[in-house]
Amino acid sequence: MKRFVLPILITLFIISASAVFTLNFRPLYYHDISSLNIEETSGYSENVIRENYDALIDYNSVFHRGSLDLSLPMSREGRIHFQDVKRIFDVLQILCVLSLIGSLILGIRAWKQGYRGFLKSAAVLSVFLPVIAGILIAFNWGNAFILFHELMFSNDYWLFDERTDPVINILPDEFFLHCALLIILLILAASLIMGLIYLRQKKRRSGGPQLTF
């Protein structure tokens, strides 16, 4: 049972770190402003779009205290939804730090004891989420997007009305698709790296040909 704890911690770290990185990777959204023609579809200037997007990202930081201040109008339901989103991201950021600490403590101990199997287990375990998510996205991104919101939120406040919450016009579904794809790629990359490290260590211990990077 103890040998499952470390791979689970590593997997939790990889998933949460990938999500936190994507949340804070603002260049992705800045690129989408032009590639998705958000200025034209929303009717707002790039400065206004960036200002409100940056306010959302700053608000979702675990260190942020206070209310969300947008230059765009916002309904009561919209504000509640963003509060719900912040709680989720706060949990993710805390989970990221705690799982990293746990992974380092147990990982260093396992490494010193000569145990490398946790790398293989974590590599395999961390693949499941992106595979499932990838299948859902490939099958129907719209339904996957709706399913995610229905699972994560206990209300329907995420169904914005652009007349009362025009911020939805600067957050197209395609942007969230790009975020999902980036998270999947990061998780798969981490899984691949762990798998390669495991194979290299296995070859080294068996005296076989060395894997080089």
Regions found by a protein language model. Give the residues of each.
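Hydrophobic secretory-pathway targeting helix
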Residues: M1-Y29
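Juxtamembrane non-transmembrane "cap" segments at the membrane-aqueous interface
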Residues: F139-E162
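Alpha-helical transmembrane signal-anchor/signal-peptide segments
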Residues: L23-T41, H149
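Hydrophobic alpha-helical transmembrane segments
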Residues: S34-N47, G66-R76, K120-F139
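Terminal transmembrane helical module of multi-pass membrane proteins
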Residues: L159-R205
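Individual transmembrane alpha-helix segments
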Residues: N60-L98, D173-I183
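Juxtamembrane interface at the cytosolic side of transmembrane helices
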Residues: F4, L100-F145, I193-F213
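Short extracytoplasmic
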Residues: S42-S61
